[in-house]
Amino acid sequence: MRYNTFYQVHKALRAMLYETAAELQRTDFNNEEEVNSVLGSITTVVDVFDKHAYNEDHFVFSAVEQYEPSVVDAFEQEHVKDHELSAQLRSLINVYKSLINDEERTQLGSAFRKAFVDFLAFNMVHMAREEDIINNLLWRYYTDDQIRAIERQVISNQTPESTAVVWKWMLRGLSNTEIINWLKAVERNAPQVVFKNLFLTAEKELAGNRFREVVNELQKAA
């Protein structure tokens, strides 16, 4: 099986979309605490997706562009659309800050739900297309080692803060087996401090029974 550079990060992004959509659905827009929480979640989502699109444009798509420029142009145009949907959500956040009327806030909640569904639906289709079309082009023109090298460029471009956010959502979106294999790979190939930070993040993010299973499997492999 060929290496799928989108697999883990897209699982993280889908988990973000699913959980934020559920939070938004149950938010009372006249409850300030609930609104502050969901607006923080939405802000994180659009920030992460904007950064993800930047990385794809500058590292992944650029590797394909020399061979298939028209395909890359089409995907870059999809990223333009994605940024427009992000901007709409950011605009609604700014509108909310100026509202004092309960009825207006309730109406804005409906606008938020529609805008987020549009954002979610677009990105679900977009990511599936990347996993099909872009992956197949990467596999045609590059070896797995070369694809991993591209991925390392993306990783090296991350701040510690953005890495922490992506790790959190990868852990929430991956299966136990996938997490175990990921931790084993990091332990083999990365500095010890990186493994330690990922392990501590797993301890924080995984439910007790899931984390115990992960630890047990790591101990068996030790």
Can you say where each PLM-predicted feature lies in the sequence?
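Small-residue-biased structural context
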Residues: 1-222
